[in-house]
Amino acid sequence: MFAFIFGKNWMLSLAELISYFEKEGVEWSFVDLTKKALMVEAEIWPEMIDELGGTLKIVQIDKWFDFVDLNKQDFGDYVDWPISVYGSHLLFKDVKKRFKRFPKDGVISHTDLIKKKIREVCLIFGMKTCYFGETIAVSNPYDFKKRDESRPVQRHELAIAPSRARILVNLSQARESIMDPFCGIGTIGQEALLAGIPKIFLSDIDKRAVEWSKRNMEWAKKAFKKKGSVIIETKDARNLTGSVEAIATEPDLGPRLQYRISEVDAKQIIGYLTDLYRAFFRSAHGVLNTGGRIAIVLPCINAKSGKVFVHKMFDGYRPVSLFEKIPQPYRDYLKIRNTILDEEREEGKARVVVREFCVYRKV
Protein backbone atom coordinates (compact mmCIF):
# COMPACT_ATOMS: atom_id res chain seq x y z
CA MET A 1 0.00 0.00 0.00
CA PHE A 2 1.15 3.54 -0.76
CA ALA A 3 0.12 7.07 0.20
CA PHE A 4 0.49 10.10 -2.05
CA ILE A 5 0.87 13.33 -0.06
CA PHE A 6 -0.80 16.23 -1.83
CA GLY A 7 0.50 19.72 -2.50
CA LYS A 8 -1.36 22.90 -1.52
CA ASN A 9 -4.31 22.26 -3.84
CA TRP A 10 -5.38 18.77 -2.84
CA MET A 11 -8.18 18.43 -5.40
CA LEU A 12 -5.85 19.41 -8.23
CA SER A 13 -3.25 16.93 -6.97
CA LEU A 14 -5.89 14.19 -6.78
CA ALA A 15 -7.20 14.90 -10.29
CA GLU A 16 -3.66 14.76 -11.67
CA LEU A 17 -2.93 11.44 -9.96
CA ILE A 18 -6.07 9.77 -11.29
CA SER A 19 -5.37 11.02 -14.83
CA TYR A 20 -1.73 9.96 -14.59
CA PHE A 21 -2.61 6.45 -13.37
CA GLU A 22 -5.04 6.05 -16.27
CA LYS A 23 -2.59 7.34 -18.87
CA GLU A 24 0.28 5.15 -17.63
CA GLY A 25 -1.88 2.05 -17.22
CA VAL A 26 -1.24 1.86 -13.48
CA GLU A 27 -3.65 -0.64 -11.95
CA TRP A 28 -4.76 0.70 -8.60
CA SER A 29 -7.50 0.22 -6.07
CA PHE A 30 -8.83 2.87 -3.72
CA VAL A 31 -8.13 2.50 0.01
CA ASP A 32 -8.71 5.88 1.68
CA LEU A 33 -8.70 9.61 1.03
CA THR A 34 -8.31 12.81 3.03
CA LYS A 35 -7.49 16.40 2.05
CA LYS A 36 -3.86 15.52 2.79
CA ALA A 37 -3.33 12.20 1.02
CA LEU A 38 -4.64 9.40 -1.20
CA MET A 39 -4.04 5.82 -0.06
CA VAL A 40 -3.99 3.13 -2.76
CA GLU A 41 -3.05 -0.46 -3.46
CA ALA A 42 -0.89 -0.35 -6.59
CA GLU A 43 2.47 -1.12 -8.16
CA ILE A 44 4.34 2.15 -7.58
CA TRP A 45 7.86 3.20 -8.53
CA PRO A 46 9.57 6.04 -6.58
CA GLU A 47 10.69 7.86 -9.77
CA MET A 48 7.02 8.44 -10.54
CA ILE A 49 7.12 11.54 -8.36
CA ASP A 50 9.36 13.31 -10.89
CA GLU A 51 6.55 13.03 -13.44
CA LEU A 52 3.96 14.69 -11.19
CA GLY A 53 3.41 18.38 -10.49
CA GLY A 54 1.08 18.17 -7.50
CA THR A 55 2.43 15.37 -5.29
CA LEU A 56 4.93 16.20 -2.53
CA LYS A 57 5.76 12.75 -1.16
CA ILE A 58 5.14 9.06 -1.75
CA VAL A 59 4.96 6.93 1.39
CA GLN A 60 5.16 3.13 1.49
CA ILE A 61 2.64 2.04 4.12
CA ASP A 62 3.96 -0.64 6.48
CA LYS A 63 1.08 -0.80 8.92
CA TRP A 64 -2.42 0.54 9.46
CA PHE A 65 -4.59 0.53 12.56
CA ASP A 66 -7.52 2.17 14.28
CA PHE A 67 -7.03 5.61 15.89
CA VAL A 68 -7.68 4.26 19.37
CA ASP A 69 -4.88 1.71 18.99
CA LEU A 70 -2.13 4.27 18.33
CA ASN A 71 -0.52 3.84 21.75
CA LYS A 72 -0.52 0.05 21.39
CA GLN A 73 1.58 0.01 18.24
CA ASP A 74 5.19 -1.18 18.14
CA PHE A 75 7.05 1.20 15.82
CA GLY A 76 10.46 -0.35 16.53
CA ASP A 77 13.50 1.76 15.65
CA TYR A 78 11.29 4.21 13.77
CA VAL A 79 10.59 6.00 17.07
CA ASP A 80 14.03 7.60 16.63
CA TRP A 81 13.26 8.83 13.10
CA PRO A 82 11.89 12.26 12.17
CA ILE A 83 8.15 12.00 11.59
CA SER A 84 5.56 13.99 9.65
CA VAL A 85 1.94 13.75 10.73
CA TYR A 86 -0.93 14.41 8.34
CA GLY A 87 -4.34 14.75 9.92
CA SER A 88 -5.86 15.55 13.28
CA HIS A 89 -3.92 18.01 15.46
CA LEU A 90 -5.85 16.56 18.39
CA LEU A 91 -3.67 13.46 18.19
CA PHE A 92 -0.34 15.31 18.03
CA LYS A 93 0.12 14.95 21.77
CA ASP A 94 -0.17 11.17 21.54
CA VAL A 95 2.28 11.03 18.63
CA LYS A 96 4.80 13.21 20.49
CA LYS A 97 4.83 10.67 23.32
CA ARG A 98 5.88 7.92 20.92
CA PHE A 99 8.35 9.65 18.59
CA LYS A 100 11.47 11.52 19.70
CA ARG A 101 11.91 13.78 16.62
CA PHE A 102 8.55 15.46 16.19
CA PRO A 103 8.71 18.71 14.15
CA LYS A 104 7.26 21.93 15.53
CA ASP A 105 4.47 22.13 12.95
CA GLY A 106 3.94 18.41 12.75
CA VAL A 107 5.25 18.15 9.17
CA ILE A 108 8.73 18.17 7.66
CA SER A 109 8.50 20.01 4.35
CA HIS A 110 9.60 18.36 1.12
CA THR A 111 12.04 21.27 0.75
CA ASP A 112 13.78 20.41 4.04
CA LEU A 113 13.82 16.70 3.21
CA ILE A 114 15.72 17.44 0.00
CA LYS A 115 17.92 20.25 1.33
CA LYS A 116 18.98 18.46 4.53
CA LYS A 117 18.88 14.93 3.06
CA ILE A 118 16.54 13.73 5.78
CA ARG A 119 14.88 10.32 5.86
CA GLU A 120 11.51 10.30 7.57
CA VAL A 121 8.41 8.31 8.37
CA CYS A 122 4.83 9.51 8.06
CA LEU A 123 1.67 8.97 10.05
CA ILE A 124 -1.47 9.71 8.07
CA PHE A 125 -4.90 9.89 9.65
CA GLY A 126 -7.51 8.65 7.19
CA MET A 127 -11.29 8.60 7.57
CA LYS A 128 -11.19 5.92 10.28
CA THR A 129 -7.72 4.42 10.02
CA CYS A 130 -4.12 5.48 10.71
CA TYR A 131 -1.48 4.68 8.09
CA PHE A 132 2.22 4.49 8.94
CA GLY A 133 5.26 4.09 6.72
CA GLU A 134 8.52 5.41 5.34
CA THR A 135 8.71 8.20 2.77
CA ILE A 136 10.26 6.63 -0.33
CA ALA A 137 10.08 9.57 -2.76
CA VAL A 138 10.08 13.36 -2.42
CA SER A 139 9.29 16.03 -5.00
CA ASN A 140 12.35 18.20 -5.60
CA PRO A 141 11.33 21.89 -5.48
CA TYR A 142 14.76 22.94 -6.72
CA ASP A 143 14.15 21.14 -10.01
CA PHE A 144 10.98 23.16 -10.56
CA LYS A 145 12.82 26.32 -9.52
CA LYS A 146 15.55 25.67 -12.09
CA ARG A 147 12.95 25.08 -14.80
CA ASP A 148 11.36 28.41 -13.91
CA GLU A 149 14.18 30.78 -13.02
CA SER A 150 17.09 29.54 -15.14
CA ARG A 151 15.44 29.80 -18.53
CA PRO A 152 16.31 32.84 -20.66
CA VAL A 153 12.81 34.39 -20.80
CA GLN A 154 10.62 34.75 -17.71
CA ARG A 155 7.30 36.43 -16.98
CA HIS A 156 6.52 35.53 -13.38
CA GLU A 157 3.47 37.77 -13.09
CA LEU A 158 1.71 36.17 -16.07
CA ALA A 159 3.15 32.75 -16.89
CA ILE A 160 1.80 29.56 -15.39
CA ALA A 161 4.20 27.89 -12.92
CA PRO A 162 6.07 24.79 -14.17
CA SER A 163 4.40 22.58 -11.55
CA ARG A 164 0.94 23.69 -12.69
CA ALA A 165 1.98 23.28 -16.32
CA ARG A 166 3.06 19.69 -15.59
CA ILE A 167 -0.34 19.05 -14.01
CA LEU A 168 -2.06 20.34 -17.16
CA VAL A 169 0.08 18.04 -19.31
CA ASN A 170 -0.86 15.05 -17.15
CA LEU A 171 -4.54 16.02 -17.17
CA SER A 172 -4.41 16.06 -20.98
CA GLN A 173 -3.15 12.44 -20.98
CA ALA A 174 -1.01 13.18 -24.04
CA ARG A 175 1.33 10.36 -25.06
CA GLU A 176 2.46 11.03 -28.63
CA SER A 177 1.56 14.64 -29.44
CA ILE A 178 0.36 17.76 -27.66
CA MET A 179 -0.54 21.32 -28.62
CA ASP A 180 -0.54 24.61 -26.73
CA PRO A 181 -2.12 27.31 -28.94
CA PHE A 182 -1.67 30.06 -26.31
CA CYS A 183 1.96 29.18 -25.62
CA GLY A 184 3.22 32.44 -24.07
CA ILE A 185 6.83 31.78 -23.01
CA GLY A 186 6.48 28.03 -23.56
CA THR A 187 6.08 26.69 -20.01
CA ILE A 188 3.55 24.00 -20.96
CA GLY A 189 5.66 23.02 -23.96
CA GLN A 190 8.71 22.75 -21.71
CA GLU A 191 6.90 20.40 -19.31
CA ALA A 192 5.61 18.33 -22.24
CA LEU A 193 9.20 18.01 -23.47
CA LEU A 194 10.39 16.86 -20.03
CA ALA A 195 7.46 14.41 -19.90
CA GLY A 196 8.87 12.75 -23.00
CA ILE A 197 6.06 13.62 -25.41
CA PRO A 198 7.73 13.28 -28.85
CA LYS A 199 5.67 15.81 -30.85
CA ILE A 200 4.97 19.27 -29.45
CA PHE A 201 3.12 22.04 -31.28
CA LEU A 202 3.27 25.54 -29.80
CA SER A 203 1.70 28.68 -31.20
CA ASP A 204 0.60 32.14 -30.18
CA ILE A 205 -0.94 35.12 -31.93
CA ASP A 206 1.77 37.32 -30.37
CA LYS A 207 5.00 37.19 -32.40
CA ARG A 208 7.04 38.14 -29.32
CA ALA A 209 5.65 35.16 -27.43
CA VAL A 210 6.65 32.87 -30.29
CA GLU A 211 10.24 34.14 -30.11
CA TRP A 212 10.24 33.77 -26.31
CA SER A 213 9.00 30.19 -26.60
CA LYS A 214 11.67 29.35 -29.16
CA ARG A 215 14.42 30.62 -26.87
CA ASN A 216 13.05 28.78 -23.83
CA MET A 217 12.48 25.50 -25.67
CA GLU A 218 15.99 25.59 -27.14
CA TRP A 219 17.34 26.15 -23.64
CA ALA A 220 15.24 23.30 -22.20
CA LYS A 221 16.46 20.85 -24.84
CA LYS A 222 20.08 21.63 -24.02
CA ALA A 223 19.70 21.98 -20.23
CA PHE A 224 17.82 18.69 -19.80
CA LYS A 225 19.30 16.82 -22.78
CA LYS A 226 15.90 16.16 -24.31
CA LYS A 227 15.08 15.38 -27.91
CA GLY A 228 11.77 15.70 -29.68
CA SER A 229 9.97 17.46 -32.47
CA VAL A 230 9.00 20.98 -31.38
CA ILE A 231 7.19 23.20 -33.88
CA ILE A 232 6.62 26.80 -32.79
CA GLU A 233 4.77 29.28 -34.99
CA THR A 234 2.69 32.43 -35.02
CA LYS A 235 -0.95 31.42 -35.24
CA ASP A 236 -4.41 32.52 -34.11
CA ALA A 237 -5.93 29.92 -31.76
CA ARG A 238 -9.25 30.52 -33.50
CA ASN A 239 -7.81 29.20 -36.78
CA LEU A 240 -5.83 26.08 -35.92
CA THR A 241 -4.54 23.55 -38.45
CA GLY A 242 -2.98 20.11 -38.29
CA SER A 243 -3.77 17.06 -36.17
CA VAL A 244 -2.96 16.41 -32.52
CA GLU A 245 -3.69 13.88 -29.79
CA ALA A 246 -4.30 16.33 -26.93
CA ILE A 247 -4.25 20.02 -26.03
CA ALA A 248 -3.00 21.59 -22.79
CA THR A 249 -3.23 25.35 -22.54
CA GLU A 250 -3.73 28.48 -20.49
CA PRO A 251 -5.40 31.10 -22.72
CA ASP A 252 -5.81 34.81 -22.11
CA LEU A 253 -7.35 35.11 -18.62
CA GLY A 254 -8.27 38.76 -19.02
CA PRO A 255 -6.86 41.84 -17.28
CA ARG A 256 -4.70 41.38 -14.19
CA LEU A 257 -7.07 42.88 -11.63
CA GLN A 258 -5.64 44.33 -8.42
CA TYR A 259 -8.93 44.71 -6.56
CA ARG A 260 -12.44 43.28 -6.64
CA ILE A 261 -14.75 44.73 -9.26
CA SER A 262 -18.53 44.76 -9.57
CA GLU A 263 -20.42 41.70 -10.77
CA VAL A 264 -21.52 43.64 -13.86
CA ASP A 265 -17.92 44.45 -14.84
CA ALA A 266 -16.81 40.90 -14.07
CA LYS A 267 -19.54 39.44 -16.29
CA GLN A 268 -18.55 41.81 -19.08
CA ILE A 269 -14.93 40.60 -18.94
CA ILE A 270 -15.99 36.95 -18.73
CA GLY A 271 -18.39 37.45 -21.64
CA TYR A 272 -15.64 38.86 -23.85
CA LEU A 273 -13.29 36.02 -22.93
CA THR A 274 -15.98 33.38 -23.45
CA ASP A 275 -16.34 34.47 -27.08
CA LEU A 276 -12.60 33.82 -27.51
CA TYR A 277 -12.82 30.44 -25.79
CA ARG A 278 -15.81 29.31 -27.89
CA ALA A 279 -13.96 30.23 -31.08
CA PHE A 280 -10.89 28.33 -29.86
CA PHE A 281 -12.92 25.21 -28.99
CA ARG A 282 -14.57 25.28 -32.42
CA SER A 283 -11.18 25.54 -34.09
CA ALA A 284 -9.65 22.85 -31.87
CA HIS A 285 -12.43 20.44 -32.85
CA GLY A 286 -10.92 20.28 -36.33
CA VAL A 287 -7.41 19.33 -35.17
CA LEU A 288 -8.05 17.21 -32.06
CA ASN A 289 -8.38 13.44 -32.40
CA THR A 290 -11.80 12.03 -31.50
CA GLY A 291 -11.76 11.20 -27.80
CA GLY A 292 -8.79 13.52 -27.28
CA ARG A 293 -8.63 15.78 -24.25
CA ILE A 294 -8.33 19.51 -23.81
CA ALA A 295 -6.87 20.40 -20.40
CA ILE A 296 -7.41 24.12 -20.00
CA VAL A 297 -7.25 26.87 -17.41
CA LEU A 298 -10.24 29.22 -17.35
CA PRO A 299 -10.63 32.39 -15.26
CA CYS A 300 -12.93 32.82 -12.29
CA ILE A 301 -13.27 36.42 -11.07
CA ASN A 302 -13.72 37.14 -7.38
CA ALA A 303 -16.17 40.03 -7.78
CA LYS A 304 -17.52 42.13 -4.92
CA SER A 305 -20.70 40.05 -4.74
CA GLY A 306 -19.11 36.63 -5.30
CA LYS A 307 -17.43 34.46 -7.90
CA VAL A 308 -18.15 34.87 -11.62
CA PHE A 309 -17.37 31.78 -13.73
CA VAL A 310 -17.02 31.11 -17.42
CA HIS A 311 -19.96 29.18 -18.89
CA LYS A 312 -18.17 25.87 -19.34
CA MET A 313 -20.25 23.96 -21.90
CA PHE A 314 -18.77 23.91 -25.40
CA ASP A 315 -20.32 22.31 -28.49
CA GLY A 316 -18.63 19.08 -29.54
CA TYR A 317 -17.12 18.36 -26.11
CA ARG A 318 -18.05 16.75 -22.83
CA PRO A 319 -16.50 17.69 -19.48
CA VAL A 320 -14.39 14.83 -18.12
CA SER A 321 -15.55 13.49 -14.75
CA LEU A 322 -12.17 13.59 -13.05
CA PHE A 323 -13.21 11.99 -9.77
CA GLU A 324 -15.60 9.22 -10.79
CA LYS A 325 -13.19 6.55 -9.46
CA ILE A 326 -13.46 8.00 -5.96
CA PRO A 327 -16.25 6.27 -3.96
CA GLN A 328 -19.36 8.43 -3.62
CA PRO A 329 -19.33 8.55 0.22
CA TYR A 330 -15.88 10.17 0.08
CA ARG A 331 -16.97 12.61 -2.61
CA ASP A 332 -19.94 13.60 -0.47
CA TYR A 333 -17.99 13.92 2.77
CA LEU A 334 -15.10 15.87 1.22
CA LYS A 335 -17.46 17.91 -1.00
CA ILE A 336 -15.64 16.90 -4.17
CA ARG A 337 -17.07 18.48 -7.29
CA ASN A 338 -15.72 18.75 -10.82
CA THR A 339 -14.81 22.39 -10.17
CA ILE A 340 -11.11 22.79 -9.33
CA LEU A 341 -10.08 26.31 -8.35
CA ASP A 342 -6.46 27.26 -7.73
CA GLU A 343 -6.88 29.96 -5.10
CA GLU A 344 -3.28 30.11 -3.91
CA ARG A 345 -2.67 33.51 -2.40
CA GLU A 346 -0.42 36.06 -4.09
CA GLU A 347 1.91 37.99 -1.78
CA GLY A 348 -0.41 37.20 1.13
CA LYS A 349 -3.54 38.46 -0.62
CA ALA A 350 -6.41 36.54 -2.17
CA ARG A 351 -6.26 36.62 -5.95
CA VAL A 352 -8.96 38.50 -7.82
CA VAL A 353 -8.63 36.34 -10.94
CA VAL A 354 -8.44 32.68 -9.96
CA ARG A 355 -7.43 29.80 -12.23
CA GLU A 356 -10.03 27.09 -12.76
CA PHE A 357 -8.68 23.80 -14.14
CA CYS A 358 -11.05 22.05 -16.56
CA VAL A 359 -10.77 18.99 -18.78
CA TYR A 360 -12.89 18.24 -21.87
CA ARG A 361 -13.12 15.28 -24.22
CA LYS A 362 -13.94 15.65 -27.91
CA VAL A 363 -17.06 13.72 -28.96
Where do the PLM segments sit?
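Short amphipathic alpha-helix with an adjacent loop that forms part of the alpha/beta core around
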Residues: 68-75, 239-243
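Generic structural signal of hydrophobic/aromatic residues within well-ordered alpha-helices
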Residues: 48, 70-71, 95
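A short N-terminal interaction module
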Residues: 75-130
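Class I S-adenosyl-L-methionine-dependent methyltransferase catalytic core
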Residues: 1-53, 58, 62-64, 89, ...
